[in-house]
Amino acid sequence: MTTSRTLRLLVVSALATLSGLGTPVAHAVSPPPIDERWLPESALPAPPRPTVQREVCTEVTAESGRAFGRAERSAQLADLDQVWRLTRGAGQRVAVIDTGVARHRRLPKVVAGGDYVFTGDGTADCDAHGTLVAGIIAAAPDAQSDNFSGVAPDVTLISIRQSSSKFAPVGDPSSTGVGDVDTMAKAVRTAADLGASVINISSIACVPAAAAPDDRALGAALAYAVDVKNAVIVAAAGNTGGAAQCPPQAPGVTRDSVTVAVSPAWYDDYVLTVGSVNAQGEPSAFTLAGPWVDVAATGEAVTSLSPFGDGTVNRLGGQHGSIPISGTSYAAPVVSGLAALIRARFPTLTARQVMQRIESTAHHPPAGWDPLVGNGTVDALAAVSSDSIPQAGTATSDPAPVAVPVPRRSTPGPSDRRALHTAFAGAAICLLALMATLATASRRLRPGRNGIAGD
């Protein structure tokens, strides 16, 4: 990618108090070097060990009397009708690596990509998260029902269930949640091998900078997907606030003051990381700042598809009532849909050129780049209309979902690494949705030592 993106990978943690984690010592942070020897082998998706469902499925609801529409969700998509005169994403395959994508009448083209959670094919979704993400990418319009639609309704989706907060390993009653950086790496390899031109990842591992994770397999898989298979990879930046979210990071964070490391976002040369803004284009209060944030899209009070029916929903149920569906998880699929539109419109562009185009056509903040919105809020019409590829905006810094500390490790061999990831696998994927108010969910989604965040 650009030199500025490469430079943003070199970050130094500053002294900061992280809730429950003490004050980390400042030291340099960067992802492990890409080593193709860590690339997962091609294999049929399957859980690393037997699992069982331990939690009831997530409740989703539609607010009574509310009219759903595109305009309420994202100002940057207000020109979708004009965009669709140029492209609707036909011919593109977008992989959703998430909690599964349920079959829905408004998602007519879903390919079962496999299941790392249970014994399914990837098209079950007990958490609701993956289906919400998929709807934002590709929901077909239905003018007789509402004004909601996905960004790229003609794409084919590849559903890979990689994580769930509702399942747990058999024989481990203290563990809740499945999904880790190893299964994420395998899922990325699978998505690339299934021909995905765009891969959406709305989950992350979020850790103190002093405890950077050993995610070499994931790094190798990301490099394989981008450099070998020419896939665009889009990831959520992550959320702060509440026990089930990432530790906060200063809004003005620079590469010299990072306290929270995020994977896969810190592989900035391979991942387009997306922060969240509100309907007015202002950074969401929950969006996690970081020197690897590239662009932003609307992620507040979104509407999408129900995994348990044939309608649309806009609220998540919880112990204390329902809450709006919000989070950087739902900003990322806006950008994934846009990437698919660009790839359909300009099929000769490489993955890196598509990522650069999205950054270059965004509405840049006053400084050209900042840690909350990166190069700015995406502009779908500009991205698919311009024949030229402008230079990326000025970048000086670089972000992911629910917080999970990962202990620093020495350099283990593959067998040692598998053992260490056994504990990591027991951590819940913290759905990037802003669900901090759900007390029981917060306890479930924030493991004691390790985990992957999501929303």
UniProtKB/Swiss-Prot annotation:
Q: Which residues cross the membrane?
A: 432-452
What residue spans carry the region label Disordered? Answer: 389-417
SUPFAM superfamilies the UniProt entry points to:
Subtilisin-like
Please indicate which superkingdom the organism of origin belongs to: Bacteria
This protein's record includes keyword Lipid metabolism:
no
Instruction: Cite the NCBIfam families for this sequence.
Output: T7SS_mycosin
Quote the protein name from its UniProt record: Mycosin-4
Q: Write down the species.
A: Mycobacterium tuberculosis (strain ATCC 25618 / H37Rv)
- Taxonomic lineage from the root: Bacteria, Bacillati, Actinomycetota, Actinomycetes, Mycobacteriales
